[in-house]
């Protein structure tokens, strides 16, 4: 087997950027930054969302206002006129005729 093909697996300190929550987990993440946590020095990985800040785990639900979204859409596109199809292009387009199938002959 080839040597040094697998990345180094080590304990890494993950820091939630939004809440400041820190936890240690095994990972192959490589970082130049290190931080002391609970008396040991770990490489640091900053994450934007963790179990401390995700709405599913915290129980805080952010409801989407469906009517507000519709109003926002109408406000944005109320001044836009719908595109009219060109009459010449519609009239010149030939109708597609269905092909007739040959009659089926019955065997005697």
Curated annotation (Swiss-Prot):
The keyword Ribosomal protein applies. GO terms for molecular function: structural constituent of ribosome. One of its GO terms (cellular component) is ribonucleoprotein complex. Keywords: Ribonucleoprotein, Ribosomal protein. It holds the Pfam family Ribosomal_L31. Residues 88-108 are annotated as: Disordered. Residues 97-108 have a biased composition (Basic residues). GO terms for biological process: translation. InterPro entries: Ribosomal_bL28/bL31-like_sf, Ribosomal_bL31, Ribosomal_bL31_B, Ribosomal_bL31_sf. Part of the 50S ribosomal subunit. HAMAP family: Ribosomal_bL31_2. Belongs to the bacterial ribosomal protein bL31 family. Type B subfamily. NCBIfam families: L31, PRK01678.1. This is Large ribosomal subunit protein bL31B. It comes from Chlamydia abortus (strain DSM 27085 / S26/3) (Chlamydophila abortus).
């Amino acid at each position: 087997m080839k040597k040094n093909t697998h990345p180094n697996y080590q304990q890494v300190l993950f820091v939630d950027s939004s809440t400041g929550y820190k936890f240690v987990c095994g990972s192959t993440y490589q970082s130049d930054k290190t931080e002391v946590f609970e008396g040991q020095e770990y490489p640091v990985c900053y994450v934007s969302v963790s179990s401390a800040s995700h709405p599913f785990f915290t129980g805080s639900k952010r409801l989407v206002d469906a009517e507000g979204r519709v109003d926002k859409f109408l406000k944005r596109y109320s001044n836009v006129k719908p595109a009219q199809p060109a009459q010449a292009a519609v009239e010149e387009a030939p109708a597609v005729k269905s092909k007739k199938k040959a009659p089926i002959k019955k065997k005697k």
